[in-house]
Amino acid sequence: MIEKVPMTRGGHAALADELKKRQSVDRPRIIEHIAEARSHGDLSENAEYHAAKEDQSHNEGRIAELEDKLARAEIIDVSKLSGDTIKFGATVTLIDEDTDKKAVWQIVGEAEADAKKGRISITSPLARALIGKKKGASVEVVAPGGAKAYEITKVEWR
C-alpha cells in the first residue's frame, strides 16, 4: 500500500512550484553548463564538467523526490478543520514554562516543515507531544536539546 504524505494546500503548492522551477529553469541551465564544460576538452580532469554533472545529479534526485511526494500527497484543507484538540494543521500557541517565552507553531507534513516560518513536522518531538492535547494542557517535550515544558494557550485553524 502506498503511504500517503499529509500536507497543507500551501505546502503542496510550494512543492509543485519548486518542481516546476527545477524542471523548466534549473534542468536546462545545468545541461547548458555541462555542454559548455564538455567543450573545454579532456573530461577526466575537467573540474567544471564534474561539478556540473554533480549539480545535475542533485537536481534530478530532488525532482524525483518532489514527484514522489506530490504523487503521494494527501492534501488536508486546514480551513475546514475545527475543534480544540490538536491535530495535523493546527496552529498552536505555547508558553515556555521556564522562560515565559511565547512560541507559535503550525503542525504540518515533513515535506513542508520550516522552523524559521513557524512550521514543524508532525513527526517532530514537539508535534508528537502536542497531538491530542487541548488548550490549557501542559506538555513536556524531550528533544535533542533536553526536556522542555510548555503550556498550550491557544489552538487555531488557519
Curated annotation (Swiss-Prot):
- Please give the InterPro entries that the UniProt record associates with this protein: GreA/GreB_C_sf, TF_GreA/GreB_CS, Tscrpt_elong_fac_GreA, Tscrpt_elong_fac_GreA/B, Tscrpt_elong_fac_GreA/B_C, Tscrpt_elong_fac_GreA/B_fam, Tscrpt_elong_fac_GreA/B_N, Tscrpt_elong_fac_GreA/B_N_sf
Disulfide feature = none
Gene3D superfamilies in alphabetical order:
Transcription elongation factor, GreA/GreB, C-terminal domain, Transcription elongation factor, GreA/GreB, N-terminal domain
GO molecular function annotation: DNA binding; RNA polymerase binding
**Sections of the chain in a coiled coil:** 51-74
What GO terms describe the biological role, i.e. biological process, of this protein?
Answer: DNA-templated transcription elongation; regulation of DNA-templated transcription elongation
Please give the residue ranges the record annotates as the region Disordered: 41-61
Q: Give the PROSITE patterns listed for this entry.
A: GREAB_1
Note whether Cytoplasm occurs among the keywords. no
Determine if Transcription regulation is one of this entry's keywords. Answer: yes
The record's keywords, sorted A to Z, are:
Coiled coil, DNA-binding, Transcription, Transcription regulation
What the protein does comes down to: Necessary for efficient RNA polymerase transcription elongation past template-encoded arresting sites. The arresting sites in DNA have the property of trapping a certain fraction of elongating RNA polymerases that pass through, resulting in locked ternary complexes. Cleavage of the nascent transcript by cleavage factors such as GreA or GreB allows the resumption of elongation from the new 3'terminus. GreA releases sequences of 2 to 3 nucleotides.
By sequence similarity, the record places it as follows: Belongs to the GreA/GreB family.
* NCBIfam families reported for this sequence: greA, PRK00226.1-2, PRK00226.1-4, PRK00226.1-5
Q: Which PANTHER family match?
A: TRANSCRIPTION ELONGATION FACTOR GREA
Record's protein name = Transcription elongation factor GreA
